[in-house]
């Protein structure tokens, strides 16, 4: 009984593995990353002390919109 349910669930999940779902998740991950970039949090590598991250780049200007 349980094995049958598992097989049905796998069959239902199959169409989403390569197609729409992965595209959706990739898009979501990209928008999360770009959202972090615009807020000035995402810098790789992290900025030196005294510099803030703006749009993914380090800047020594005072960044007043980051709540620290």
UniProtKB/Swiss-Prot annotation:
<dbReference type="GO" id="GO:0099106">
    <property type="term" value="F:ion channel regulator activity"/>
</dbReference>
<keyword id="KW-0732">Signal</keyword>
<keyword id="KW-0964">Secreted</keyword>
<comment type="function">
    <text>Probable neurotoxin with unknown target. Possibly targets ion channels.</text>
</comment>
<dbReference type="GO" id="GO:0005576">
    <property type="term" value="C:extracellular region"/>
</dbReference>
<keyword id="KW-0027">Amidation</keyword>
<dbReference type="GO" id="GO:0090729">
    <property type="term" value="F:toxin activity"/>
</dbReference>
<protein>
    <recommendedName>
        <fullName>Conotoxin Cal14.13a</fullName>
    </recommendedName>
</protein>
<feature type="modified residue" description="Valine amide">
    <location>
        <position position="66"/>
    </location>
</feature>
<keyword id="KW-0872">Ion channel impairing toxin</keyword>
<keyword id="KW-1015">Disulfide bond</keyword>
<keyword id="KW-0528">Neurotoxin</keyword>
<feature type="propeptide">
    <location>
        <begin position="22"/>
        <end position="38"/>
    </location>
</feature>
<keyword id="KW-0800">Toxin</keyword>
<feature type="signal peptide">
    <location>
        <begin position="1"/>
        <end position="21"/>
    </location>
</feature>
């Amino acid at each position: 009984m349980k094995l049958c349910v598992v097989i049905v669930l796998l069959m239902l999940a199959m169409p989403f593995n390569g197609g729409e779902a992965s595209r959706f998740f990739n898009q979501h991950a990209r928008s999360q990353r770009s959202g972090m970039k615009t807020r000035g949090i995402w810098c790789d590598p992290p900025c030196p002390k005294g510099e803030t991250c703006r749009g993914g780049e380090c800047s020594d200007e005072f960044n007043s919109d980051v709540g620290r």
